[in-house]
């Protein structure tokens, strides 16, 4: 069905949203983005967050940490782990920064919520070292990072809710496949019916 761009949406009662907020444990950055997610070029506004998945009947969870480019909605980098550690988010960030130029870094804003990952010095110092502007949502305000929240909602409706996975290895493989498909094949109305990768390639020919 994905190849034909036809999707069957699966509905399920949603569990409580994962929150990485632990109070003020480090630097809280101002809300520079302020719900203006308009980016005139790629690598100007990156959005990030962490979401969790739990297979029915299992206590263990896995955590997904992606970076989304506000310009075309592409997932630039992501990591998956069985624990919501600093390594989860820091590795994702390091992998993303390898893909852009020094000039891009100086014009980049990275926006997140106030989760402990993003308040921690390992995150904020990495941004400062690369001359990247840090932006944070107001506490408990998901609309301040709505494109990222929307991506999580779409992902879970289209590949997770209502699907039975035998184990977490299978689920991780399906998340990998979904993000590959989302970037390269899933069309977006606001991108003139193109996928994020196709839109970017045609705009920059």
Whereabouts are the PLM-identified features?
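RNase H-like two-metal-ion nuclease catalytic core shared by retroviral integrases
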Residues: 20, 112-114, 120-121, 136-156, ...
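K/E-rich alpha-helical interaction surfaces of small helical-bundle regulatory domains
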Residues: 173-193
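Active-site beta-loop-alpha junctions of metal-dependent nucleic acid enzymes
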Residues: 60, 79-103
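Mobile genetic element proteins and their domesticated derivatives, centered on retroelements
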Residues: 1, 33, 49, 67, ...
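Basic, flexible linker segments flanking DNA-binding modules
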Residues: 1-41, 141, 196-200
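An active-site-proximal beta-strand-loop segment
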Residues: 35-76, 83
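Conserved small/polar residues in nucleotide/adenosyl-binding loops
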Residues: 203-205
């Amino acid at each position: 069905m994905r190849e034909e761009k036809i999707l069957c949406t699966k509905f399920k009662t949603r569990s409580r949203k994962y929150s990485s907020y632990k109070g003020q444990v480090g630097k809280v950055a101002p809300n520079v983005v302020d719900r203006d997610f308009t980016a005139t070029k790629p690598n100007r506004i990156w959005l990030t967050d962490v979401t969790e998945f739990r297979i029915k009947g299992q206590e263990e969870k896995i955590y997904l940490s992606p970076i989304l480019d506000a310009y075309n909605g592409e997932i630039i980098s992501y990591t998956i782990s069985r624990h919501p550690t600093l390594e989860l988010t820091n590795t994702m960030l390091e992998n993303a920064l390898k893909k852009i130029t020094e000039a891009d870094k100086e014009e980049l804003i990275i926006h997140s919520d106030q989760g402990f990952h993003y308040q921690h010095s390992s995150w904020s110092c990495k941004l400062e070292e690369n001359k990247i502007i840090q932006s944070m949502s107001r506490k408990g305000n998901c609309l301040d990072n709505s494109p990222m929240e929307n991506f999580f909602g779409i992902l879970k409706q289209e590949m997770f809710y209502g699907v039975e996975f035998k184990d977490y290895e299978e689920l991780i493989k399906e998340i990998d496949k979904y993000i590959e498909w989302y970037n390269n094949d899933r069309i977006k109305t606001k991108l003139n019916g193109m996928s994020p990768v196709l839109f970017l390639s045609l705009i920059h020919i």
